Structures are given as C-alpha cells and as structure tokens.
C-alpha cells in the first residue's frame, strides 16, 4: 500500500474563522508531508491562499442550510468518485449531511473513510447529530468530548479523539512588541488610547461575548486606574442593531472617553500584544478559545470564566486568570488584583500547531491502515 494519502476536506465557505483556519492548516501540513490535499467549499477570500499553499480547491455550493442543498448530493458523489480520496473530512453540519447521502450510494469497498471534526457545541438535535456519525470524531477540546458524551451517547467513546487546536508560536512569539510605526498609526486613529492601561475584549460583536461585563468593569475601574476598554471585532449586518445598542449603552454610562470599538482588525496579534489585559467572558462555554491562547503566547495576561475550552487553556497556561463563571464581583476583584500587581504569564508550551497537525495526520493514517 502506498504511504501517501489523499484527503478531501469539506466545509461551507472559506472566508474567516476557526474552522477555515484549521482547514488551511491541515492542507498545508498534508502538502508538506507529500500527501495530496483537496478542499470542497462554496469558495471565499481564503481560496487563493489555500491554492498557493498547494491544496486544490473544488467549488460546490455546500453552504446553504436549506433542503435545496440536497441537490448537491449527486454532484458531490461524482466529485468523490472522480477524486477517489482515502479520507473525507467533514467540518460542518450542512457538508456533513450532503456527504452522508453522497457516500450511501457508493459501494462500501470503494467508499473513502469518513472523519468529522466537532468544532462547536451545537444545538442538540437530529440535525447536529450528523457530526457524530463518522468513523472517527475529532473533538477540539475536552469540553467538546463531554458535550458529545452527554448529548450523543450513541457515539462510541472509542470513536472520539480529542485533538486540541493549536497555534504557531513563531507567529505569536513571547514578549512580542508591535513596531513603532504600528503604535504611531494606532495613536493617530485612536488618540484616546495613548498612555492608557488597555483592557481588551476580542471577538465578533454578538450577545454571547460578554460586552456588558466589560462596560461595567470599566465604569468601576476608571475611578482608580487609568484604564481604557477596547472592543476588537466587527459586527455583521445581522448584529448591527446590537452594536448600536452597545454604543448607546456607552453613552448612557458616560463612558465615551473610556471605551473604544475598533471594529474588525487583521492585526489582532498587535492588539493582543499591546493590551495590558485580555478578557474572555462569553456567556456560553467556548469550545476552545484560540484568542485566549494567542494572547497568552504573546505574554499578555488573560482573565476568563472557569468553563469550556478557555478554562482548559487557562488551567494549563495561566490559572491566575480563572474566575467563577458569571460572577461579576469575583471578576472585578481578579482584574483589580492583576492591575495592582501584574502577573505576566510564562511562555506557552502546550497547544502548538505542529501537535495538532501531527495528531490529525496520524489519525488519518491510522484509519486507512498505513501504520
């Protein structure tokens, strides 16, 4: 049997986000090891990068959450028969359903092996259950493993493999400092941030991210510390109303000089490094918490709720940042303590990108019996 393998990853689109990033990372790792990498999606702005890194992209509209997506079953089956991948790796629910029906009419002996990754703690229903119906189910954290055990007991424990997502520490070097040019541009755009202690809440603008906690914190802390709250992340059209609501709340609380919304940024590394504290205050458990990890890798302290993937990262890398979930008083005390007596995190040793890619490729090879 040949030691090279062909892997086809499927996801809705290739624009931005953790699922997309992970797809590119695995594609890159496959190509680097001499394997063949194919991605099927509806396309997006990351396609040129994907192709530049050696992965072939096949465009198919497998992104719509509607019954019309079932019309893509036959075209996908044709693609699979044409490409003959060893592994089909589904990373989202709509592509998983289309793949499920596409594979059913392929004879067992000609069928590729099916792997899924559960990237999120989806709403619990039959639609989401498809993510647990693969030969191997990758969970991106122990919290996701627990979620699968609890809500999908039919999924054999032996099928579930926990593979943490990881980051490239060369991209997030410890004690990294933004360039003088970056600081100059920052102060030109946002002069109100100069000489301030920056407390940053990164992430897209949604009700789940805990912005209210940030506003209340800044309102209390500004009486004692020279703080400024920074919200890094944009709002899509559907969430624009919530952003307007938050900005009105800032006015109502008289915090215009103490909180800044900087919108979507491509220079997140610089913002995390420039921050004195980064917060992770989602109202629901995070499946992993990549931004928490990126901030810690750079040497920036992170404070977050003691639950979900963020707690797994903080427990290993910065336990001083853990706070009882939804406890506003404990949160204030913790941040007050860290502002009064800063405790920078030690260099991160775990959650490296190479560990994630090596474990995933090893799983592929195990499933197709190459080892």
Sequence positions of predicted segments:
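A conserved, positively charged/aromatic
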Residues: 108-142, 154
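Short hydrophobic beta-strand element within catalytic cores of glycosyltransferases
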Residues: 39, 301-304
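A short helix/loop element that forms part of the nucleotide-sugar donor recognition site in Leloir-type
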Residues: 173-192, 245-247, 342-344
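Glycosyltransferase donor-sugar binding loop
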Residues: 40-45, 202, 228-244
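A conserved mid-protein helix/loop that constitutes part of the nucleotide-sugar donor-binding site
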Residues: 17-25, 197, 201-222
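Short His-centered aromatic/hydrophobic patch
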Residues: 90-96, 118
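Conserved acidic donor-binding segment of nucleotide-sugar-dependent glycosyltransferases
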Residues: 316-328, 336-340
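Active-site donor-binding acidic/aromatic loop of nucleotide-activated sugar
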Residues: 238-244, 256-265, 271
